Amino acid sequence: MALVAATPVGMVDDPCPPPLAVPEPVRTFNAMFLAPGKVDMPRLLALTKDPAYVAYNAEKTAREATDWAGLCRYRRDNDATIASGRRPKAVFFGDSITEAWVLGDPDLFGDAVIGRGIGGQTSAQMLVRFRQDVIDLKPRVVQILAGTNDIAGNRGPTSERDYQNNIMAMVELAKAHRIKVVLASIPPAATFIWKPELIPGPKIARLNAWLRDYARREGLTYLDYHAVLATPDGAMRKGWSLDGVHPNRDGYAAMRARAERVR
């Protein structure tokens, strides 16, 4: 409650609270979630009931309520990057799959390749932060990976046209600033554990076909991670994900060869 009460009101010089420290139970949960092989599910679930884990999620949710686009998530990191004078070669831009990539394959990232993923975000939210988290950093190339949460309707009902418009807007912004664009396919999923009533496979296939065709028309690079991760029926390959949506370390390792083309 103290966090909400301390939230600035109106237009201010610095609307962002101090960075949110990640407590040990959350770090342990993330490590277990990304670990290949059999996972100790009782222990994993017990971590989500740890008071520090619960408090962290509550604080994170409170911040998201006043920062819909997640502009505060990387603001200080961006300021530090710009102040250093180092221009990153590539920005990996996306949702939780991109956010977890930094943990799942840390050797891929560093000063030259940086991650700007935020869990749960739709393409509409990503579009709002595209200038701050991509354009202002002046990278040579940006990889855009979005769509899972649009299909899930994480921020309410939407349409394929809305998704396509958001992708096209980000591409046009990048081109206007001479940033090369890589469009990544939406990874496979037979179901979403947070929206079990949905059958996402057909929409994933349809949107990936559109992404591929749009990339070809616009002279962009299209990276098909779906083909690497998917079974013939469109599910995530067994052993490469705990929840069937987010890759684990083995899943990210399988994506590495394609990811290294983002240069």
What positions do the PLM features span?
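Oxyanion-hole/transition-state-stabilizing segment in secreted/luminal serine hydrolases
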Residues: 92-93, 98-116, 124-165, 187-191
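Loop/turn elements at helix/coil->beta-strand transitions in domains of secreted/extracellular proteins
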Residues: 87-89, 111-112, 137-142, 175-182, ...
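Second-shell loop/turn segments in exported
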Residues: 115-120, 155-160, 171, 197-200, ...
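Catalytic His-Asp segment of secreted/periplasmic serine-dependent ester chemistry enzymes
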Residues: 187-263
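N-terminal secretory targeting modules
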Residues: 1-91, 103, 107-108, 137
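Extracytoplasmic/secreted proteins, especially bacterial periplasmic and envelope-associated proteins
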Residues: 92, 121, 125, 129, ...
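A generic secondary-structure signal
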Residues: 132-136, 169-173, 258, 262
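Charged, glycine-enriched surface loops/patches
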Residues: 160-184, 210-220
